[in-house]
Amino acid sequence: MEITNVTEYDAIAKAKLPKMVYDYYASGAEDQWTLQENRNAFARILFRPRILIDVNKIDMATTVLGFKISMPIMVAPTAFQKMAHPDGEYATARAASAAGTIMTLSSWATSSVEEVASTGPGIRFFQLYVYKNRKVVEQLVRRAEKAGFKAIALTVDTPRLGRRESDIKNRFTLPPNLTLKNFEGLDLGKMDEANDSGLASYVAGQIDRTLSWKDIQWLQTITNMPILVKGVLTGEDARIAIQAGAAGIIVSNHGARQLDYVPATISALEEVVKATQGRVPVFLDGGVRRGTDVFKALALGASGIFIGRPVVFALAAEGEAGVKKVLQMLRDEFELTMALSGCRSLSEITRNHIVTEWDTPRHLPRL
């Protein structure tokens, strides 16, 4: 049976993967309300398409931090990809490169920055947590820089791991044949033994709970890579992030895996965009499963979106070919959405192309 949309990979991955692995990728925090809401909120945004516009040629190309990419659809960092498929991050890196877009490598990857760089050319960002031992952070950043990575996506919503109950029930542990490749050979000190998500026996216990805005300024002293602050949900924090030197903001709720009952990212996006006043680009991850979702995010002011779970599920189902197909399907759907909405380039996508539940009834301009 031919796969015709991104969501269909979910069921295939569920059937293929061990329960512990699938649940790790699929689950959210606590009641998983935000996990559902990340999807549901997109469904409450409707289109106001414009007609009789020549849409014979559609241009989806854009630039992110000065790097030209083929479309505003990028790959979010997801941990432990070799649990999904033996090729893991290698396959994802090759697929993103073939699609002409950016891959963000998780620092909790099962392939190292050097290994991912060895897959060939491509624009790659490195996701970073700040650890208690700052020497570890420095080593990770230097290695990413040396391996040709172009930016840091600093995760700021995880002073502690969220409570993901399926991981507790399944007693989640990384399969014994896999390691956190970026930490091999680094002195991590004594690991904390805790029971947050059964994960803390790994590097999680080393995440620095004292992380604050001054650490973003410190990071800028050890690297020239631009820093994207990932995990912003409010206008207040967007403004502070810019003051602290952020080159961009990723509106993210960590795939609904941290604090439950935060808004869907698509619901938080516009507040953040307004607060930045165009000073830095704003991106979104969380709940994107259709080209229509990509369009809605851009109409609300995002410069691009990142996808996480769809990549991992497609990887589990079909390896590199699956990830390529997910990126291609989203690209094709997004192109079609642009055409049917009357937009020939990303700059033509405006707030007037959508209507949200928080919009007041419109008084149409006199023509």
Swiss-Prot record:
Q: In which pathway does it act?
A: Photosynthesis; photorespiration; glycine from 2-phosphoglycolate: step 2/3
Protein name as it appears in the record: Glycolate oxidase 2
Q: Tell me the function of this protein.
A: Catalyzes the oxidation of glycolate to glyoxylate, with a reduction of O2 to H2O2. Is a key enzyme in photorespiration in green plants. Glycolate is the preferred substrate, but to a lesser extent, this oxidase is also able to use hydroxypyruvate, L-lactate and glycerate as substrates in vitro.
Q: Which UniProt keywords apply?
A: Acetylation, Flavoprotein, FMN, Glycolate pathway, Oxidoreductase, Peroxisome, Photorespiration
What Enzyme Commission number(s) does the record list for this chain?
1.1.3.15
Q: Which cofactor does it need?
A: FMN
Gene3D superfamilies for the chain: Aldolase class I
What are the catalytic residues? 254
Q: Site annotation (Involved in determining the substrate specificity of glycolate oxidase): which residues?
A: 108
Pfam family for this entry, one: FMN_dh
FMN hydroxy acid dehydrogenase domain location is 1-359
Q: Where in the cell is it found?
A: Peroxisome
Per the UniProt entry, what are the Gene Ontology biological process annotations, in alphabetical order?
Answer: oxidative photosynthetic carbon pathway; response to other organism
User: According to the UniProt entry, which residues carry N-acetylmethionine?
Assistant: 1
Give the main localization category.
Answer: other
**Which leading EC class covers this enzyme?**
oxidoreductase
Q: Which molecular function GO terms apply here?
A: (S)-2-hydroxy-acid oxidase activity; FMN binding
> GO CC: one term?
peroxisome
Summarize the subunit comment. Homotetramer.
> Which InterPro entries did the record assign?
Aldolase_TIM, Alpha-hydoxy_acid_DH_FMN, FMN-dep_DH, FMN_HAD, FMN_hydac_DH_AS
Q: Which family does it belong to?
A: Belongs to the FMN-dependent alpha-hydroxy acid dehydrogenase family.
Residues that bind FMN: 77-79, 106, 127-129, 155, 230, 252, 285-289, 308-309
Q: Does the keyword Metal-binding apply?
A: no
User: Which reaction is recorded as catalysed by this protein?
Assistant: glycolate + O2 = glyoxylate + H2O2; a (2S)-2-hydroxycarboxylate + O2 = a 2-oxocarboxylate + H2O2; (S)-lactate + O2 = pyruvate + H2O2
What is the superkingdom listed in this entry's lineage? Eukaryota
* Record-listed glyoxylate binding positions: 24, 129, 164, 254, 257
